[in-house]
Amino acid sequence: MKYELVAGFETHIELATKTKIFCGCTTQFGGEPNTHCCPVCIGLPGTLPKLNRQVVRYGIMAGLATHGEIAEISKMDRKNYCYPDLSKAYQISQLYAPLTIGGYVELSSGKKIRLHHIHIEEDAGKLIHQHGDTYVDYNRGGVPLIEIVSEPDIRSIDEAREYVEKLQQVMRYIGISDCKMQEVSMRCDVNISVRPVGSEKLGTRTEIKNMNSINNICKAMEYEFERQVDLIESGGQVVQETLRYDDATNTTSSMRSKEDAHDYRYFRDPDLVTIHVTRKEVEEIKATLPDLPTEKCKRYVDELSIPEKDAQLLTKYRNISEYFDKACEGVKSAKTVSNFIIGQIFSRVETEADKEVFDVSVSPEQLNELVKLLDSGKIRNNLAKATLEKMLDSGKGALEFISESDMGGLDENAMLELCKQAVESNAKAVEDYKNGKEKAIKALVGFVMKNSRGKADAAAAEAKIKELIG
């Protein structure tokens, strides 16, 4: 019997506010243990929380960016459970009236992964295990989160990977989080079950907790899918439980039985007022959102004639797309700008982290100036490429490296003379070309380009050389 994977995600994203959700403590990552906390975020008796309005704003932005409906009224609830990293013995979260309802994340295939809701909540502290002892660091306690809860629409590991990558990309684009999984500012709980292909009935699910690596998410899902299938086919039953993933052994193991909502005894938090969001506020926030990557990619393809693969590279990070947009202002061909960025500038930006920041020595205005010189016919493509390399090395503008004599192409007589010299000076290349080696012509064209300092038109030079060889 063939089985299919059924998965849904609960994705926790740390919001990029300066202070925590219910107090004025800093949210800065790191710091000595228990130095970024106060009586409110460690839950001392008599303290009262005060909701950070920026958290609500960021939650609304996330909802709009994922096509959700913003609730006019939402409320904070207490999720009750005892654990050392939860100082109050409850977490302030949302269950009954979350901030955003519905929405979806669209994959490259066109499939839409539906979202159940997005809610805001506080993070817990962190347990540190050392030499057989366990310590608690409350610096992270009270850091604001959104939790994005998907429907069980994911049917493959590839869909899971793309779903997480798309969420990460969108949240970075709108500027509400850096989504650095290695710093746990984005982490996922994966709910997974299996069922026979063609069946509509959901199987018993397990939950793999606190995954903060996309590669580990994929490996854990693959292992858990195979484990559940093997268990069912051997006559066993899948137990609803919470699992941890061990990347060293590539296995999952049980942490505890899986709780349902009623196990947490949710009730309305009496210390926090109802959140009211007006339609006017939603529209004002919507107006501040940047173009999102999917829409921007489509625009590059449809309006600027950028190949889809290149458009995806240009829109992967917001800083790159904004650089590209500025460099394209007033140019004849956006494709030329794209070629320079992808072909040359990217070679100086080695890591994905560097591409996300995209702090390069050539400003978009400087690249724009270079492309306009090329557009006007004052310089040729080879000279433009060579000039860009010098610009990247120095941070200087194009005109620092291009003299008046470099501008404008070769006249016909000068081109003919250089082509004759190329043929006369490169007998072996001429002979190779005559013997059917097409690539040999490149050496002859290279001679012309070098001796013209890039002013010659390469295509015209190649045609003239072929004419001379006969």
Label every model-predicted segment.
Residues 184-196, 301-325, 334-352, 362, ...:
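Core structural elements
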Residues 294-301:
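Extended, structured, electrostatic nucleic-acid-contact surfaces
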Residues 377-378:
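Extended, charged alpha-helical coiled-coil/arm scaffolds that mediate oligomerization and mechanical coupling
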Residues 357-368, 372, 381-450:
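Strongly charged, low-complexity linkers/loops
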Residues 160, 311, 337, 384, ...:
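Small-residue helix-packing motif on alpha-helices
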Residues 1-291, 308, 329-333:
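Basic, nucleic-acid-interacting segments
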Residues 438-470:
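Short, amphipathic C-terminal "tail helix"
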Residues 62, 224, 340, 344-348, ...:
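Amphipathic alpha-helical segments in well-ordered regions
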